[in-house]
Amino acid sequence: MKRGVSALVATLAFLCATGAVAVAATQIGTDGPDRLSGTVAPDQLYGEAGDDQLLGFSSNDYLEGGPGSDDVEGADGLDLVIAGTGDDDVDAGPGNDVVYAGAGADLVLGGPGADTLFGQADADRLFGGSGNDIVYASDGEDFVDAGSGKDRVYSDEGDVTIDAGPGNDWVIAIGGRVLVDGRDGNDRIRTGPFDDQVTGGFGADSLDSGGGDDTIRVKDKKRDRVECGPGRDTIYADKVDSLIGCEDVHTRGARIG
């Protein structure tokens, strides 16, 4: 079947909602720059090659950019976005969306809702927005801003900078050098065997630094717990904090285990 920008291929599914009939369709672009727009029904938009613009609408859409530097907007609904290769910009919009960044230096905005964001190769910028998000950084020097909510951030390869945002967050970043700030909330942060910089932020945090010569800051007058690993770590703490296995401690009266 020939693929063309004007082709509305595949399914004409008739959905009766609020007494109206909605038509769901699949749109497939060309190898050049395309602009594909969804409808009120669940749509599937494929940009193919070229620098494309894909616009979802008010339903649960599937948006795939393909090769090229694409601009993808999910709008309302529970959307699945595959950015594809290239330096893409993705705005998932409201709803509990899933976004795969793909190869290239991508910008991903999760927006309101409990989103799941996957970074891929190259230096991605991943913003969770509001909601309880899950963010996976990958290889490449990624930047993660989890936003507000009880977020979970994972990184098992590559260097990463993480702003966990307000909320009681979990951060596990063990695959490269890490710069992480827990911000407000009672956070749990674990890093790996590299020379990391960790700031707990305002809240009763639990930090496990792993190996490496780490710098850890938990001076916020809250009761934090820090467990240092192999390597020589530098800790800035309060007297109410509990420090385990830490070498170079800068505080007065902290309990050192």
Regions found by a protein language model. Give the residues of each.
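Glycine-centered beta-turn/loop sites at beta-strand termini
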Residues: 29-32, 38, 47, 56, ...
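Disulfide-bonded cysteine-rich modules in secreted/extracellular proteins
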Residues: 27-29, 257
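Bacterial N-terminal signal peptides
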Residues: 9-18
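Bacterial N-terminal signal peptides that target proteins for export
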Residues: 1-9
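Leucine-rich solenoid repeat scaffolds
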Residues: 218-257
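Sec/Tat signal peptide C-region and signal peptidase I cleavage site
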Residues: 19-26
